[in-house]
Amino acid sequence: MKNTFSWIKKEITRSISLSLMIYIITRTSISNAYPIFAQQGYENPREATGRIVCANCHLANKPVDIEVPQAVLPDTVFEAVVRIPYDRQVKQVLANGKKGGLNVGAVLILPEGFELAPPARISPEMKERIGNPSFQSYRPTKKNILVIGPVPGQKYSEITFPILSPDPATNKDVHFLKYPIYVGGNRGRGQIYPDGSKSNNTVYNATAAGIVSKIIRKEKGGYEITITDASDGRQVVDIIPSGPELLVSEGESIKLDQPLTSNPNVGGFGQGDAEVVLQDPLRVQGLLFFLASVILAQIFLVLKKKQFEKVQLSEMNF
């Protein structure tokens, strides 16, 4: 009886350990793949050259647009609208080799002091325009750099960021100046992972010249292509994942770096910039006072002119 209980206890412990291991592996896999690879490998998403690092993985160049107010007052919430246009009818190759809708993502690089507006400061009208996307800071110490994605492109090809402007009265590092804002936006999956390996959303080239002596279609998708050097019989096997369409056939002579597959990528990355002026309220008040003074001066001038004309008219009648 004691041995039976001991055996049951051992099996339960083994099952719990196995379940925990599977959970950890699965959890790690998900976290490594979602959402922003750039956060894992780069301290700052914008290089000294001005290039945003997302372009290292998303090789195709596509447009992106950003719209912000020309000027904002301190300690106010405004909208930065990022548009990531693409053809809604196209499908991309997913990680499992099947076709699916495109996802989108964006990184917004704000000036120091600007940050994501807290929910309590966002008006109901703005909340309705924003929807319910999940924004996050690029780093806990970099609240001025915001990222989102991947999110469904059908719903979020236009992303509205609620931004809180800083107040120079409380933040001495901020001044009433014109500031640049940078944005990067992608649609679809990348072609290269941060470790340099290829995804299945890109073209695969021959790693050797020779004759395609054998093509094996793998059970779970993809191909093994054996290339034989005609001069010495040396063989090289190129592994093609599920997704790209095969372009070569057995017996075909190929060159080094010749495409073995089509390029399935239908997405791409783009970057842009805009400018916003942090406006001094006193300057605005001064401008309004000046305009009011000009308008009043014009009114008095018109009244004085009419009064003068009346005097002239009365003298002529006299």
Curated annotation (Swiss-Prot):
One of its GO terms (biological process) is photosynthesis. Binds 1 heme group covalently. The chain crosses the membrane at residues 284-303. One of its GO terms (molecular function) is iron ion binding. Disulfide bonds: none annotated. One of its GO terms (cellular component) is chloroplast thylakoid membrane. Its main location: plastid. It is found in: Plastid, Chloroplast thylakoid membrane. It comes from the Eukaryota. Pfam families: Apocytochr_F_C, Apocytochr_F_N. SUPFAM superfamilies: Cytochrome f subunit of the cytochrome b6f complex, transmembrane anchor (SSF103431), Cytochrome f, large domain (SSF49441), Rudiment single hybrid motif (SSF51246). InterPro entries: Cyt-f_TM, Cyt_f, Cyt_f_lg_dom, Cyt_f_lg_dom_sf, Rudment_hybrid_motif. The keyword Nucleotide-binding does not apply. Its cofactor is heme. Heme binds at residues 34, 54, 57-58. It is a single-pass membrane protein. Residues 1-33 form the signal peptide. Keywords: Chloroplast, Electron transport, Heme, Iron, Membrane, Metal-binding, Photosynthesis, Plastid, Signal, Thylakoid, Transmembrane, Transmembrane helix, Transport. PANTHER family: CYTOCHROME F, PTHR33288. The 4 large subunits of the cytochrome b6-f complex are cytochrome b6, subunit IV (17 kDa polypeptide, petD), cytochrome f and the Rieske protein, while the 4 small subunits are PetG, PetL, PetM and PetN. The complex functions as a dimer. Component of the cytochrome b6-f complex, which mediates electron transfer between photosystem II (PSII) and photosystem I (PSI), cyclic electron flow around PSI, and state transitions. Belongs to the cytochrome f family. This is Cytochrome f. It comes from Oenothera elata subsp. hookeri (Hooker's evening primrose).
